[in-house]
């Protein structure tokens, strides 16, 4: 057993759990699985110094990613740096001013179909302490006043819009000509209506996905104890409680999460952000520890020496995995 054995152990556990109780008793080498799970947990615990992983990855991003940071699309890297108290290169804001000035339309939209472009920038710039109502003379909030526009991107659009609006406790703009004005209540209701029978959320289909479930929880977390959710407060609490149970149940026996059949770091990252938003410690809460391995342990098992994270265990350092992994650890440590 090594730190790279997670996929094999998870597959073996799935095969074992699919058997009837009678058939399980016939598996002569079942103790090998149990011992492998315990050994894996010990290896992960002994090999990982989580705070060091967080610090070294932050150093790596600051030192090596200046070119990546100085462009639209690097918002998750910027968000992690800004929220961790590190410096964001000045070139990033200059690049954003240029991008906004070249792409924004008369309705304040950076993209005709993706409201998340506005939302992501609002999240990043708010974390930097920038004025999102005056980026090269343009107000990024304006587009988020139109519910139809937000809902064009379905679940993702609504999640990001709510996160963006709440990141600075922003008032929602009144958009002239909008058929349906956006409100926080309408965005929350959309998420509640989209919750699946199993208690989670999915980009498509009727089975919960860890990433979308975690992201929906992130968006609803601020309303868990009512806030301005009004009469929806009770419904939000019930929905989030169900989702937390679902996320706990989806965790693999090696502490991680699978998406489309692959054990990966990004799913673990999203779950960590969701749990910290609720005040749940993802490293110590028993619901998110399997065979001694927490979801934070799982994320850190994808760490690449020198800083950064892999997408999958046998992969190379990955930009998206690194951005989300660092952002997740920032949410955990801040």
Indicate residue ranges for each PLM-predicted region:
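Beta-rich interaction/scaffold domains
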Residues: 1-45
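A composition-driven surface/loop motif
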Residues: 12-18, 191, 247, 299-307, ...
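Ser/Thr/Asn(+Pro)-rich, low-complexity disordered segments
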Residues: 43-47, 84-86, 94-95
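N-terminal module-boundary/linker segments of secreted carbohydrate-active enzymes
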Residues: 45-69
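An alpha-helical repeat/solenoid feature that recognizes helix-turn-helix modules
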Residues: 64-88, 110-133, 150-185, 189, ...
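Core helices of alpha-solenoid repeat scaffolds
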Residues: 93, 137-141, 184, 188, ...
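Asp-box/WD-like beta-propeller blade repeats and closely related beta-sheet repeat scaffolds
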Residues: 141-153
């Amino acid at each position: 057993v090594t730190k790279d054995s997670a996929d094999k152990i998870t597959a073996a556990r799935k095969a074992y759990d699919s058997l009837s109780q009678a058939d399980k008793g016939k598996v002569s080498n079942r103790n090998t699985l149990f011992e492998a799970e315990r050994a894996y947990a010990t290896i992960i615990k002994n090999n990982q110094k989580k705070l060091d992983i967080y610090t070294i990855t932050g150093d790596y991003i600051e030192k090596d990613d200046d070119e990546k940071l100085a462009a639209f699309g690097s918002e998750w890297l910027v968000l992690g740096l800004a929220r961790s108290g590190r410096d964001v290169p000045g070139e990033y804001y200059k690049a954003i001013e240029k991008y906004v000035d070249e792409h924004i339309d008369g309705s304040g939209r950076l993209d005709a179909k993706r409201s998340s472009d506005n939302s992501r920038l609002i999240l990043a710039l708010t974390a930097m302490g920038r004025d999102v109502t005056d980026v090269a003379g343009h107000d990024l909030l304006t587009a988020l006043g139109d519910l139809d526009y937000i809902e064009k991107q379905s679940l993702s659009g609504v999640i990001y819009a709510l996160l963006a609006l709440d990141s600075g406790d922003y008032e929602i703009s009144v958009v002239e000509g909008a058929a349906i004005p956006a409100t926080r209540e309408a965005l929350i209701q959309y998420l509640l209506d989209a919750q699946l029978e199993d208690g989670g959320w999915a980009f498509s289909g009727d089975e919960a996905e860890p990433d979308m479930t975690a992201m929906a929880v992130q968006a609803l977390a601020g309303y868990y104890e009512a806030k301005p959710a009004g009469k929806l407060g009770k419904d939000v609490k019930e929905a989030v409680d169900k989702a937390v149970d679902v996320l706990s149940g989806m965790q693999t026996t090696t502490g991680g999460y699978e998406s489309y059949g692959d054990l990966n770091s990004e799913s673990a990252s999203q779950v960590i952000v969701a749990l910290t938003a609720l005040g749940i410690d993802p490293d110590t809460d028993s619901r998110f520890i399997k065979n001694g391995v927490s979801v934070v342990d799982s994320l850190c098992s994808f760490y690449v020496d020198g800083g950064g994270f892999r997408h999958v265990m046998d992969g190379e350092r990955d930009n998206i995995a690194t951005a989300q992994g660092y952002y997740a650890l920032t949410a955990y440590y801040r």
